[in-house]
Amino acid sequence: MAYVRLACLAVIFFFAASVMFTVEAGIPCGESCVFIPCISSVVGCSCKSKVCYNNHVIAAEANSVDDHHLLCQSHDDCIKKGTGNFCAPFLDHAVQYGWCFRAESEGYLLKDFLKMPKALTN
C-alpha cells in the first residue's frame, strides 16, 4: 500500500514539474498582480491592468507616455512623474518610449550645488 502512495506522489510530482517548466519557458511574466506586485520584476516585468507583462511589451503597446507610470520620452518626463530621473531607451528602435530609472550618482546630486551664482548680491 505504501508503494501505491509513493507511485501516486511521484506521478503528481513529475506532472507538476513538467507543467512548471513549460509555463516558465513560455510566459516569463504570466502571474497576476492584483494584491502583490510582480514577483518576476527581476527579469523585467511590470504590472499593467492587474497582469504582469514584459517592460518592452508595455512600451511597444502604449499609445502615449501616460499609459504607464514608468514610460518616458525624456528625462524631464521621469522627473515630472516622480518615477526617476533618467529615461533609458529600449534597444528595439521600433519602441518609441523609454523606461524611467532612478539614477543616484554623486555627480547628479552635486550638479546644482557646484553651480556658480550668476551675480553676487551683498
Swiss-Prot record:
Propeptide: 56-122
Signal peptide: 1-25
Record-annotated disulphide pairs: C29-C45, C33-C47, C38-C52
Keyword Transcription: no
One Pfam family recorded for the sequence: Cyclotide
Keywords assigned: Disulfide bond, Knottin, Plant defense, Signal
Positions of crosslink type Cyclopeptide (Gly-Asn): G26-N55
UniProt cross-references to SUPFAM superfamilies, sorted A to Z: Cyclotides
PTM description: Contains 3 disulfide bonds. This is a cyclic peptide.
Tissue: Expressed in seed but not in root, nodule, flower, stem, shoot, leaf and pod (at protein level).
GO BP term, example: defense response
Superkingdom of source: Eukaryota
Family stated for the protein in its record: Belongs to the cyclotide family. Bracelet subfamily.
Domain notes: The presence of a 'disulfide through disulfide knot' structurally defines this protein as a knottin.
Function text: Probably participates in a plant defense mechanism.
Name this polypeptide is given: Cliotide T8
Highest classification ranks of the organism: Eukaryota, Viridiplantae, Streptophyta, Embryophyta, Tracheophyta
